[in-house]
Regions:
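Helical lid/core segments from catalytic subdomains that handle acyl or acyl-like groups
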Residues: 22-84
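A short beta-turn/loop motif at secondary-structure boundaries
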Residues: 8-11, 66-68, 110
Length: 144
């Protein structure tokens, strides 16, 4: 695993770094969920990682795994209690924002159709409009 990347490096597998709420007061732990090609395996592994959160440990430990760069992850904040129409994301740009940040909101039924807001902050050098639209099409397929 490389610790430094530039725009010419190719990463064939990424993880999801996401905060998981563990208490009603908003306390959360960041976890790293490895990528698996099939959803069943991903779900099983993600559930085990989330169930195994130790509330006495450092809630940011997962962000320290693999170095401080976080260049092999997609950052995902899930806000299932919030339905939004617009969201502005901020990041500490240590590396020029060359990793995507996504926020997925509350799925609701509007006009008889299941919809879910998704906001993404991306660097055009990392993801172009074509591939971003393919992602949104895949989300639409899952919501049908």
């Amino acid at each position: 695993r490389k610790t430094k990347m530039n725009y010419m490096d190719v990463v064939d597998m990424i993880a999801v770094a996401t905060p998981i709420k563990v208490a009603d007061n908003g306390r959360f732990f960041t976890v790293r969920l490895p990528w698996y090609p099939d959803f069943k395996t991903f779900y099983t592994e993600a559930k085990a990682i989330i169930s195994g959160i130790d509330p006495d440990k450092d809630p940011y430990e997962a962000e320290k795994t693999g170095g401080s760069d976080l260049l092999d992850v997609v950052l995902l904040s899930a806000t299932p209690d919030l339905y939004f129409t617009s969201l502005t994301c901020t990041q500490e740009h240590r590396h020029g924002g060359n990793y995507p940040l996504m926020n997925a909101g509350k799925a609701v039924i509007r006009g008889g159709v299941l919809v879910m807001p998704i906001a993404m902050t991306i660097h055009h050098g990392f993801i172009d409009g074509h591939h971003l639209s393919l992602f949104y099409k895949k989300v639409e397929e899952f919501l049908k």
